[in-house]
Amino acid sequence: MSEDPHHIPAGGDDLPAAVRREIAAHHALYARSPEAAHMWDPIVIGVPGGPVPCLLLHHVGRKSAQRLNSILQYYRHDDDIVIVASKGGLPHHPVWYLNLLAEPACAVQIGAFHSDAVARTLAGAERASWWQRVTAEQPVQLEYQARTTREIPLIKLELRTPAPRRSGPA
């Protein structure tokens, strides 16, 4: 999947306007200065936990077939990258996750680094192990899970090219 400098933020129509504005501003910052956008403090949308590492996920709309982008916090252990489809504990999955279910081929940008990837939803013991890591790093994910009856999906991004090591919590 080749890089496209023009991005269309995916979904989020059911999020509050202030949250959508902050996410749009973060998209714009990623376009201008990907290294500056890599670390982001979600307190601007009311989520505690301090600055978190964010990636830009490039995926294809399952209905529109358009190339879409979503900025997401990610979690890293060794060379593994995982994203969480919590959507703040809303009752339905985020659009980007539904798109990945329909077409797992995607691309990832972490700062200035780019790689094609394949998305895979974690299950069983692998999911349980990652859920412990995720909630240790971001306890708010436990609150999100408590708000919804759906099991919050954890998605491993299997990168074609391993991401370089970064400083900070990533």
State what each model feature region is.
Residues M1-V47:
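Extreme N-terminal tail/first-helix region
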Residues L55, P153-I155:
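Short beta-strand micro-motifs in enzyme catalytic cores
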Residues L157-P164:
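Short beta-strand-to-coil "C-cap" segments at the C-terminal boundary of structured domains/repeats
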Residues D4-A10, D14-P16, S86-Q141, R147-E151, ...:
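Short, structured beta-strand-loop surface elements
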Residues P51-S86:
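Short beta-strand segments
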Residues P48-P51, E151:
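A short, polar/charged loop/turn motif at coil->beta-strand junctions and beta-hairpin connectors
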